[in-house]
Amino acid sequence: MADLSLADALTEPSPDIEGEIKRDFIATLEAEAFDDVVGETVGKTDYIPLLDVDEKTGNSESKKKPCSETSQIEDTPSSKPTLLANGGHGVEGSDTTGSPTEFLEEKMAYQEYPNSQNWPEDTNFCFQPEQVVDPIQTDPFKMYHDDDLADLVFPSSATADTSIFAGQNDPLKDSYGMSPCNTAVVPQGWSVEALNSPHSESFVSPEAVAEPPQPTAVPLELAKEIEMASEERPPAQALEIMMGLKTTDMAPSKETEMALAKDMALATKTEVALAKDMESPTKLDVTLAKDMQPSMESDMALVKDMELPTEKEVALVKDVRWPTETDVSSAKNVVLPTETEVAPAKDVTLLKETERASPIKMDLAPSKDMGPPKENKKETERASPIKMDLAPSKDMGPPKENKIVPAKDLVLLSEIEVAQANDIISSTEISSAEKVALSSETEVALARDMTLPPETNVILTKDKALPLEAEVAPVKDMAQLPETEIAPAKDVAPSTVKEVGLLKDMSPLSETEMALGKDVTPPPETEVVLIKNVCLPPEMEVALTEDQVPALKTEAPLAKDGVLTLANNVTPAKDVPPLSETEATPVPIKDMEIAQTQKGISEDSHLESLQDVGQSAAPTFMISPETVTGTGKKCSLPAEEDSVLEKLGERKPCNSQPSELSSETSGIARPEEGRPVVSGTGNDITTPPNKELPPSPEKKTKPLATTQPAKTSTSKAKTQPTSLPKQPAPTTIGGLNKKPMSLASGLVPAAPPKRPAVASARPSILPSKDVKPKPIADAKAPEKRASPSKPASAPASRSGSKSTQTVAKTTTAAAVASTGPSSRSPSTLLPKKPTAIKTEGKPAEVKKMTAKSVPADLSRPKSTSTSSMKKTTTLSGTAPAAGVVPSRVKATPMPSRPSTTPFIDKKPTSAKPSSTTPRLSRLATNTSAPDLKNVRSKVGSTENIKHQPGGGRAKVEKKTEAAATTRKPESNAVTKTAGPIASAQKQPAGKVQIVSKKVSYSHIQSKCGSKDNIKHVPGGGNVQIQNKKVDISKVSSKCGSKANIKHKPGGGDVKIESQKLNFKEKAQAKVGSLDNVGHLPAGGAVKTEGGGSEAPLCPGPPAGEEPAISEAAPEAGAPTSASGLNGHPTLSGGGDQREAQTLDSQIQETSI
């Protein structure tokens, strides 16, 4: 501190340091503000520049603000100048690698510094860069730290990120590697600042150098995810995510956010991403070939960041991940082996970074896989929000799948390329749409992101993309067992994705595209379902059609799935419990429905093929949606999808019916799957597929209460079917709010079970009951396997059990229902039995909801609406899909049970009516009883009041009448009537009241008396007061004073004064003086006492002033002299006579 402070003090930077410190505080505040979980869709980019202007006036502002704004807008050019301006790191390309790494480290150090203010420490390891960057870097840090996420990110991160974008390999590496390293290292290092910085330095260098492409993706995602986490979540959580260092993370989270955001160049990147968003799809494709995964990821992330400015935070995580994932999936699909290799390097390099930057589940997970899994686990556990990190241990286990997946990858590579094209098309398009959707869904993801399911979601998305990545990423997974572990971590969530990706990869490279289209798109589809449903129904159809075509394609992939089935089976090997993957089974349901929807598309063949493929394709299919559900996002999205799909169903015109059916069927399957996934959290947790899905949901539920949010989102989204048009936004809002609510209410243990109960009820609605018998044990066993996640999500596990049962039994049913008709039957069974199970699931729900009356009521109505949704979805989805009576039967049972069940079967619904009825009863009773009581009490009070004056009769009569009437108006009327009657009858009582008032009147009299006494005091003797109280006191005092005034002008005051002296000397009785006064003006001395009143009266009228004087004289002949003398005459008492006479004569003369 001292050295740097001295150096800076000697040089210009010391103000910068001060400014930076100030900015540090501001940055902390800003970071917290940005942590707005509400999801500042108003881009931090937009917001922070204002803060920058305020905070960073001066070097930082000029450098950083222009840099941040420019770099945000121009990003690459601006960022480079920013680096130059900030740290002279203008060399973004290779120089950035060294310089930005140092610079980022320095930034981290500076961020750390503002927080720690450990210039020496930071300087120690960062000093060399700092020396160069130090003055400027102070600004970068100030900027960086100050803008916290936006500006510093923009200048430094934007520079670095611009480097990421412009020199995406190195800059990303540097910006990223540093950001992740710094973020990863620095967050931890931030805890250990000194250690941190050197660590980040050394760390960054390898990472930046080693990870160049991937670190970009990972750090980018890391930063963004963390940033999102940080922004959306408290910096502490973000850092918890980042570092898992909850303690240090608080401050570092900001810094990390700053570092991440900055490293991510979030705002800049976001803005750049805005521009790049436009570019990024192209860049995506170019980058895809480019395999600048980081670039693509950056671009995509930027693209998504574009949206991110809107949903920047959530979108950051999602978008970063999404584009990263999508780009990564495209790039990774194209380059994945390389990137996978890079990813392993990343894993190796990112090990640290991942360990530290564990928040980025994608990268962190790979790192985790490498060595950091434990650390990641710690971090993840610490940053439990990042479930993926938690999952990495699982991932460490699941690597098998990923390892197996590489075979898939080998097989899938062509498929991946195909999927690549598709993914690039669908992923890129979908990514774009997804990005678009992401913004809205990212908003939803904001909630999720808040919960960090988004990370999982994003990771799932990444995994979705990674399924492509997983396809290629199986190589990546091979290399990135970390990422495969991430995928396992993701497998927690991404297991699904990876299974989805794997299954997807297996069956759906096409189907993965379906899954990507669906998974990637469903996130987009879900998201796009939001958007797509709204805007992209065709795309959703495309996704669904894609799904349909992929269904065929899935059949073709089924051949691939033959291989992929091996991979799938291998994946199920991992997902062995769910080899019939619960998800797979729901997929059969979904696929059944989808297959039914895609019936024309070789529905039976597809289903059979999918099911034959171990229903892996179907699981893939279903996993896509279920992954969607499994994904935090997807959980919400399935809900959204439900609503959106229902929306689609509502918007059947919007979506072609095939799409509608597909989307609706998918929506049903997805919502249902989502429900099972949500409910199947435990279930999914149970098996890798389930684990994939549920771990993310369930883990989400545990650490994040995201499962609750997810379930809540699902249930709420389902619940929100009523607001289906609003659903995208409501889900987004609801997703956010509800997830926060879920966090708020969902965090409450009761809430998760309730929502999970709802979810489980709904998943139960799907296959819950069908699955219930056998899968319970299976589901429980897998759940036990998933027990690590399960403990926190025990409620979810219960729901998961049902959902597992649902999924497992559905798998059985799906397996049994290999054929389309059989699928229909399971579909039909699903609605029917799940309805009963819904009832079962909802008794707990009812109880829980009863505990949670309002939330429960919401859930119940939502459940009802969801049932209606399911009805509608099942009807529309199944009817077209099944096209057979079963769908109608399903429809009929669903309507009766959803209608009836929501009320009858849905005990929650029954509870709701009952609750509502009790409320109504309470309200009615309360209204009636309170009204009666209130009326009586009021009437009684009124009566009591009136009774006291009015008498007992009024009370009795009033009470009797009031009791008979029991109504205020009548009671009041009676009271009034009785009151008047009582008053008329007992006016004496009223008089008594008056008497009591008389008491107060006596007080008034006392007041008057006091006033009179006051006046009397000036007036003079009490004797005269008795005689002349009223007239004299009132008239004489005022008139006398006035007369005296007139006399003063009229006559010499000196005389009055001399009179005062004389008066005092002569001091005679006032009475005499008054009489004499009156006599003098009036002339009648004989009337002295008796005529005191007469004298004033008589002379008063005749002698205008004299009477006034005489009047004044009578009361105060002194008052006349009393103007000056009166008070004194009172003292003198007598002496008024001569003086008064003298005064009077003089006054008379004067007046005359």
Curated annotation (Swiss-Prot):
Domain of life of the native organism: Eukaryota
Pfam family, one: Tubulin-binding
Record cross-link Glycyl lysine isopeptide (Lys-Gly) (interchain with G-Cter in SUMO2), residues: K838
Region Disordered, residue ranges: 50-100, 362-401, 641-991, 1074-1152
Keywords on record: Acetylation, Cytoplasm, Cytoskeleton, Isopeptide bond, Microtubule, Phosphoprotein, Repeat, Ubl conjugation
Cross-link Glycyl lysine isopeptide (Lys-Gly) (interchain with G-Cter in SUMO1), where in sequence: K269
Disulfide bonds: none
PROSITE patterns documented for this protein: TAU_MAP_1, TAU_MAP_2
Repeat positions for Tau/MAP: 923-953, 992-1022, 1023-1053, 1054-1085
Localisation: Cytoplasm, Cytoskeleton; Cytoplasm, Cytoskeleton, Microtubule organizing center
Biased composition (Polar residues): 68-81, 654-666, 680-689, 704-725, 911-929, 1142-1152
InterPro entries linked to this entry: MAP2/MAP4/Tau (IPR027324), MAP_tubulin-bd_rpt (IPR001084)
Modification sites for N-acetylalanine: A2
Bias kind Low complexity: ranges: 788-819, 861-878, 1105-1119
PTM characteristics: Phosphorylated at serine residues in K-X-G-S motifs by MAP/microtubule affinity-regulating kinase (MARK1 or MARK2), causing detachment from microtubules, and their disassembly. Phosphorylation on Ser-787 negatively regulates MAP4 activity to promote microtubule assembly.
Entry's Gene Ontology molecular function annotations: microtubule binding; microtubule stabilizing activity; RNA binding; structural molecule activity
GO CC terms, sorted: axon; axoneme; ciliary basal body; cilium; cytosol; microtubule; microtubule associated complex; microtubule cytoskeleton
Positions annotated as 26 residues repeat: 352-377, 378-403
Compositionally biased tracts (Basic and acidic residues): 53-67, 371-384, 644-653, 769-786, 839-848
Task of the protein: Non-neuronal microtubule-associated protein. Promotes microtubule assembly.
Subunit structure: Interacts with SEPTIN2; this interaction impedes tubulin-binding. Interacts with TRAF3IP1. Interacts with KNSTRN.
Name of the featured protein: Microtubule-associated protein 4
Source organism: Homo sapiens
Source taxonomy: Eukaryota, Metazoa, Chordata, Craniata, Vertebrata
Underlying gene: MAP4
